[in-house]
Amino acid sequence: MAPNHGALLYEGKAKRVYYTDNSDEFLVHFKNDATAFNAKKHAQLEGKGSLNCEISTEIFKLLERNGIATHFLNLEDDCWMLVQRVDVIPIEIVIRNIASGSLCKQTPIAPGTELSRPLMDLYLKDDVLEDPLLTEERIDLLNLLSSSQRKEIQRLSLRVNDCLKEFMKGLDLLLVDFKLEMGFNGSGQLLIADEISPDSCRIWDLKTNDQDDRILDKDRFRKDLGGVLEGYSEILRRIKAFNS
């Protein structure tokens, strides 16, 4: 059952954000929509919203336990999350540990190559422009971040990566890469926002060497492999088994 909420603030490809009676809090509803290639590919997968909401909840709690502040406040229902209000930075932060996806299209690095160190790529959040890659000069030109803010984002992103990589390893999972969004709350604190789920991460199963079977994330949808919900469910199952 949906919790009480106010008017719709924003609807994206995978979530809706609603006002609440507290001006410092929002309610986020995770949708069952599956999209890829900037929503050029679209489907409805019953139960996907609930899986992403629960997985994000567990990961946000993990980060909080490790001293990394997030916008998460409470899981209100199976696909509803109460979060702090933040001013989201219009930048997508992608941390890469293993070469995959666009990195392999833009460089000669072979898919599956372990990178010598985590690579941080920044992208402008703009669907019309299809989220172009940003350079430091472009960030300065667009006045998106100060130098100190860029350094803080990098520091925080790498902390998240260290925490998630170690956690995933304990679940026999490999964190290939993932997307983060961040924002500032009313006190000016930088928080991890949005979601961290198989929609925003590439996660491989270390229990198999099969290049298709090991995929447990949205690449199953992108590549028409089927079993999208089964992959997401397996990630949640391992998280819950670890926490029990």
UniProtKB/Swiss-Prot annotation:
GO terms for molecular function: ATP binding; phosphoribosylaminoimidazolesuccinocarboxamide synthase activity. The keyword Ligase applies. This is Phosphoribosylaminoimidazole-succinocarboxamide synthase. Its EC number is 6.3.2.6. It comes from Prochlorococcus marinus (strain SARG / CCMP1375 / SS120). It holds the Pfam family SAICAR_synt. It catalyses: 5-amino-1-(5-phospho-D-ribosyl)imidazole-4-carboxylate + L-aspartate + ATP = (2S)-2-[5-amino-1-(5-phospho-beta-D-ribosyl)imidazole-4-carboxamido]succinate + ADP + phosphate + 2 H(+). Pathway: Purine metabolism; IMP biosynthesis via de novo pathway; 5-amino-1-(5-phospho-D-ribosyl)imidazole-4-carboxamide from 5-amino-1-(5-phospho-D-ribosyl)imidazole-4-carboxylate: step 1/2. InterPro entries: SAICAR_synt/ADE2_N, SAICAR_synt_PurC, SAICAR_synth, SAICAR_synthetase, SAICAR_synthetase_CS. It is an enzyme of class 6 (ligase).
